[in-house]
Swiss-Prot record:
One of its GO terms (cellular component) is membrane. Residues 96-114 have a biased composition (Polar residues). The keyword Transmembrane applies. The lineage of its organism: Viruses, Varidnaviria, Bamfordvirae, Nucleocytoviricota, Megaviricetes. Keywords: Lipoprotein, Membrane, Myristate, Transmembrane, Transmembrane helix. It is found in: Membrane. This is Uncharacterized protein L682.
């Protein structure tokens, strides 16, 4: 039964990903037409760059809003109202002391000669 639930969840994620991928191409075409209409190539790189940065900022803000709306917040968060984004750095740190894990490195690099 656990495999069925896992498969159902994985299949749902793949299906949602495919829908988002298809929708992204539709948005790409629309945004390219808007860009060509209001910022033709004759306007120069500066105005097209400003347009690209503006659209990127708007899309990032929408993504953060949707993340919070759907409750996709960190489960390990201490404060339930905390909406900050945290990244998993466990491959870099050992998780307990906040310092890099150097257990495989030699501690004494000096060479003794007799």
């Amino acid at each position: 039964m656990g495999n069925y639930i896992s498969f159902k969840k994985e299949f749902g994620l793949i299906l949602v990903g495919a829908i988002i991928f298809t929708a992204s191409y539709l948005w790409k075409d629309l945004l390219l037409e808007i860009e060509e209409k209001y910022f033709p190539k004759g306007y120069g790189l500066m105005w097209r760059s400003i347009y690209t940065i503006l659209v990127t900022v708007i899309l990032v803000l929408v993504a953060i809003h949707l993340k919070n709306q759907f409750g996709l917040v960190n489960k390990d968060s201490k404060d339930p109202k905390d909406k900050s984004i945290e990244f998993d750095d466990s491959p870099i740190r050992d998780g307990s002391s906040g310092t890099p894990d150097n257990s495989n490195e030699p501690t004494d690099l000096s060479v003794e000669t007799s």
